[in-house]
């Protein structure tokens, strides 16, 4: 810490308002290669790369994701579960930073349990989507783009939530680096009368289409079915059993 000086700064407003230096920076000099280090951390951060999709049916929702994680230009994992249960009848897919997504999921689960303990009832999907949007809008999870799928008293819901916290309820949606390939399949094959099994097939085809073209997606598929009875997540290394 700097030693207090007897300098009078009352006539020097620039000392208070004009000095934009970081108060947490070193007192002498600067951190060496600070910008380069920040860039290196970004390059070496574990990311899901990812293709994730969500579809709404009459009886529930279907979420599907690939299983690959990347570290820079390297495939860091071939067995990542990118869809997680966060509510008795709700699940969340993740695309973006793995660390931010893990923190977001833990925070949301804690808030859901607290809500249930205080009110004695499950949180609605509208309230859950708002909570997610607020978390993302806070900036702490800015590099995550989730899809929320769930069922409540008003029926099935699919929400697309962007990294800035905006919330849009959709019939179907996609996120991730392979989303443009998956979206083409969904637009051709989705309709609101799909059964759960038919929706699983369409979701698998959309993920398979992305895996064939997107380098950051691959290594199998996770499928999550959410109904009023709960959340079921299954893992498949081969697409053939689904399509």
Curated annotation (Swiss-Prot):
Residues at the active site: 50 (nucleophile)
CDD domains, alphabetized: proteasome_beta_archeal
Propeptide residues according to the Swiss-Prot or TrEMBL record: 1-49
SUPFAM superfamilies reported for this sequence: N-terminal nucleophile aminohydrolases (Ntn hydrolases)
Keywords linked to the UniProt accession: Autocatalytic cleavage, Cytoplasm, Hydrolase, Protease, Proteasome, Threonine protease, Zymogen
GO cellular component annotations of the record: cytoplasm; proteasome core complex, beta-subunit complex
One Pfam family from the record: Proteasome
Disordered, as annotated region: 1-40
GO molecular function: threonine-type endopeptidase activity
Catalytic reaction annotation: Cleavage of peptide bonds with very broad specificity
Subcellular localization(s) per the UniProt record: Cytoplasm
EC number: 3.4.25.1
Organism superkingdom: Archaea
Principal place of residence: cytoplasm
Notes on activation and inhibition: The formation of the proteasomal ATPase PAN-20S proteasome complex, via the docking of the C-termini of PAN into the intersubunit pockets in the alpha-rings, triggers opening of the gate for substrate entry. Interconversion between the open-gate and close-gate conformations leads to a dynamic regulation of the 20S proteasome proteolysis activity.
One BP annotation, GO: proteasomal protein catabolic process
Quaternary structure annotation from Swiss-Prot or TrEMBL: The 20S proteasome core is composed of 14 alpha and 14 beta subunits that assemble into four stacked heptameric rings, resulting in a barrel-shaped structure. The two inner rings, each composed of seven catalytic beta subunits, are sandwiched by two outer rings, each composed of seven alpha subunits. The catalytic chamber with the active sites is on the inside of the barrel. Has a gated structure, the ends of the cylinder being occluded by the N-termini of the alpha-subunits. Is capped at one or both ends by the proteasome regulatory ATPase, PAN.
Role according to the record: Component of the proteasome core, a large protease complex with broad specificity involved in protein degradation.
Similarity section: Belongs to the peptidase T1B family.
Name assigned to this protein: Proteasome subunit beta
Species of the source: Haloquadratum walsbyi (strain DSM 16790 / HBSQ001)
Name of the gene encoding the protein in the UniProt record: psmB
